[in-house]
Amino acid sequence: MKEATAARPKHGVLYRALSEFRHFGTYPFNMRILLLTNMLYAFVLPVVELFVGTYIMRNSSELAYVVGYQLAVYTGIPITFLVNGFLMRRIRIAHLYSFGMLLSGVSMAVMMSLETLELGGIILAGLIMGLSYGFFWANRDFLALASTDDGNRNYYYGLESFFNTVASVVVPGMIGAFLGATADHGWFAGNINFAYKLVTLFVFVLTIVASTVVMRGRFAEPKHDRFLFRRFDTLWWRMMRLAVLKGIAQGYIVTAPSMLVMTLAGNETTLGTLQSIGAIVSAVLLYLLGRFTTSHHRVAIFSAGLLLFALGGAFNAALYSAAGVIVFMLCLVLGRPLMDLGYFPLQLRVIDCVSRREHRNSYAYIFIHEFALYLGRFFGCGLFIVLTLAVSDTFAIRYALLIIGVIQLISIPIARGITHTLDQSER
């Protein structure tokens, strides 16, 4: 008689983690490669988005320089989308994607090499970073569209948001502590700018590893079709309005945390600590949303992100203190990925629909979508500059987020209408 064997517990943390890993393995190979690449690059983005802004603030104390840098970045992105559309006909898409990741390290190196921070040098570094983002996002969007379908895009963007949120905990906390300790303990003879250069080296190493991973993908190359058009389906123009509204928040959302924390809350250590608070819970929630929700839940998820952003802006305007910054950062840590989780799958679903209707290269929609985002970003940055010049820096930092958050709420009925039209067309 065989001895009875104890049944393995099927509710432990390790078992559940292995189960989720096996579930990940059921998805298409190219989708998994793309997610692994994005996971690695997720640890670069917080460095670029957060600490470049604080580096400019520390070495110039000019809020306008931070916004000028961001405008240069946003100007470089759509130009690169245009160039990328032509290069895709001659160069492998994985190579262009890798080039974009590597350029982010080059931009930071240019910034750190400047002996004195002047507007011209800052704009040059911003344009290079714009090239980096352009090659990265243009090819990433195309690969995401080609490697996923509407049935698995919630999972794709949920897992991607999980990576991004975990990185927003680990990277700001570690690098913020490193930069703070450099200043407090006199490491490198107290030269904090040398510490920033070591952070730039860290970025280079990660981008090289991420580039190696994406080269393993077996991605189909795009068709050499025309991608420049002026007329589009009415459904796409509605999507473009949504893109402009999304861009308005992007125009200020990247630099806002750096300016708020350096102005009201402290230094880089504080910046890293604030980003870490509550982000672990956010990461788990985002993964679960991506794992178990469907396309029918996207508008609700998107709306929740928009409401959180507006709520954070309201608290910042009302309190305008370190406490207000903490509340805003907590709202941002959860609200921003919720907006992305609801927005990007909807965008790709619309592209699938209108590209079939109009028999066009899907990159045509990815390209023009970026220009809609640029219009919004320009408005967002421009609003801050106008408020700064017309009133004061304090007024701009205090109220711009609230104004943008309220404007963003217009996106909710637009997204609901787009989803309704898509559902009707697919019946």
Identify the function of each model-found stretch.
Residues 1-31, 147-253, 406-427:
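Intracellular loop-helix junctions on the cytosolic face of multi-pass helical membrane proteins
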Residues 33-49, 70-76, 80-84, 125-179, ...:
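Substrate-agnostic recognition of the 12-TM MFS/MFS-like secondary transporter fold
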